[in-house]
Amino acid sequence: MNVTAKYELIGLMAYPIRHSLSPEMQNKALEKAGLPFTYMAFEVDNDSFPAAIEGLKALKMRGTGVSMPNKQLACEYVDELTPAAKLVGAINTIVNDDGYLRGYNTDGTGHIRAIKESGFDIKGKTMVLLGAGGASTAIGAQGAIEGLKEIKLFNRRDEFFDKALAFAQRVNENTDCVVTVTDLADQQAFAEALASADILTNGTKVGMKPLENESLVHDISLLHPGLLVTECVYNPHMTKLLQQAQQAGCKTIDGYGMLLWQGAEQFTLWTGKDFPLEYVKQVMGFGA
């Protein structure tokens, strides 16, 4: 890639950041499409996020991706949110139009697209959703919009629990999907939810390095062959949860699917051009 003074900058703001495949994926796509943009990762936490946004404006960056732990905080620093982003209460994409910042959430659309591309119809189905952070709630919101009948959200009683309750209220008031929130410590309720679920989705960082030997499913017998198990974590590619699911005979979707489809939508939002999907799948090894 021959970067010139005509190139515009796109960023990714997260902490930690060095594990991310997004810079490699987006830069390969930008180079293939012949577009004058370059994509760079920046270590930005909640404390430094406000200053980073001011920097984005000052440098006239085209936009930025937003990842943990900034997805919910970022909503406070944009001028406009899409209806889906309002429902989620978190964003993963900011587009800068001459200083006017628009916030989007492509995590949900990306993950649901990955599920649909696998041939699974979510309409009328029940999802057990692990976690209440930005990615998890985005998946839940998009699933509700696209026809899930019920979402059983499980989260620890941490700083996200009240946010989970608020999220459930927004979805229940604005869609036909019924969302309940339960403490993950209630293992009996978790077991009962899995027994009747069609989809289990991990929206937490459990399974991601350095937690690669952990899973929120402590008893593999809770997983049944009729269950579709999906991951947001892609590093490592094969998480402990996915290993458990395959041992139990479940169909699985790894975190590459969400990474690919959410990134494709981001690419188009920033550039106005189509994402070179098949090329990126090949060079990144996502189809392997």
From Swiss-Prot:
Pathway listed for it is: Metabolic intermediate biosynthesis; chorismate biosynthesis; chorismate from D-erythrose 4-phosphate and phosphoenolpyruvate: step 4/7
Q: What is this protein called?
A: Quinate/shikimate dehydrogenase
Q: Which residues bind NAD(+)?
A: 132-135, 155-158, 205, 232-235, 255
Identify its protein family.
Belongs to the shikimate dehydrogenase family.
Q: What catalytic activity does the UniProt entry give for this protein? A: L-quinate + NAD(+) = 3-dehydroquinate + NADH + H(+); L-quinate + NADP(+) = 3-dehydroquinate + NADPH + H(+); shikimate + NADP(+) = 3-dehydroshikimate + NADPH + H(+); shikimate + NAD(+) = 3-dehydroshikimate + NADH + H(+)
Gene behind this chain? ydiB
Q: Which domain of life is it from?
A: Bacteria
One short Pfam name that applies is Shikimate_dh_N
Sites binding substrate sit at 71, 107
Q: Which SUPFAM superfamilies does the record match to this protein?
A: Aminoacid dehydrogenase-like, N-terminal domain (SSF53223), NAD(P)-binding Rossmann-fold domains (SSF51735)
Q: Which UniProt keywords apply?
A: Amino-acid biosynthesis, Aromatic amino acid biosynthesis, NAD, NADP, Oxidoreductase
Organism from which the protein derives? Escherichia coli (strain SMS-3-5 / SECEC)
Keyword NADP among UniProt keywords: yes
Task: State the EC number(s).
Answer: 1.1.1.282
What quaternary arrangement does the UniProt entry report? Homodimer.
- Any one of the GO BP annotations: chorismate biosynthetic process
